[in-house]
């Protein structure tokens, strides 16, 4: 996700005039900095907490700034799972893997930076596992306060989960 400011004043997010802020999920810092440098227009500054030095075409070094998204942990609980005979022996593991793949973990994939996690989209993910008939799914950023509700995030954040944050009560 790239936030940019083309005017002469600071915006509501604190972006300085004539600057970009790349919020990047995944990848190596050095690769990210090289890509930003290659695509950066003249006179545009970069902002962010990560700073990587790149070598310019003239042999000079230039500091490239960018940010990683703020991780928003998501806990998921599937309750009342009802299945048919088509449900595979490793179906619970498949459900857990499907949830992690859809939301994304700390390394890759899932819902985009700045995108709300919509509760109503999760059932479609779970019904892809053969033999799933019915269930309820609850989500939240606190394991003790799960709800059937959306999880909004700001433009510099990303929802993440992992196997240990997904509970399936069959």
Descriptions of predicted regions:
Residues 1-115, 169-170:
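Carbohydrate-recognition loop of C-type lectin domains
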Residues 67, 87-170:
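An aromatic-glycine-centered, glycine-rich loop/turn in mixed alpha/beta architecture
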């Amino acid at each position: 996700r790239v936030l940019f400011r083309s005017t002469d004043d600071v915006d509501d997010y604190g972006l300085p005039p004539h600057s970009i802020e790349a919020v990047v999920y995944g990848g190596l810092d050095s690769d990210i900095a090289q890509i930003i440098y290659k695509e950066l227009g003249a006179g545009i500054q970069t902002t962010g907490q990560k700073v990587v030095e790149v070598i310019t075409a003239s042999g000079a070094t230039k500091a490239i700034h960018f940010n990683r998204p703020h991780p928003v942990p998501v806990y998921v609980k599937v309750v009342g799972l009802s299945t048919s005979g088509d449900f595979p022996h490793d179906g619970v593991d498949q459900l857990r893997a499907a949830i992690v793949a859809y939301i994304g973990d700390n390394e890759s994939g899932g819902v985009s930076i700045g995108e709300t996690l919509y509760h109503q989209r999760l059932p479609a993910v779970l019904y892809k596992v053969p033999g799933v008939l019915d269930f309820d799914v609850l989500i939240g950023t606190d394991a003790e306060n799960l709800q059937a509700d959306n999880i909004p995030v700001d433009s510099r954040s990303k929802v993440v989960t992992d196997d240990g944050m997904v509970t399936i009560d069959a």
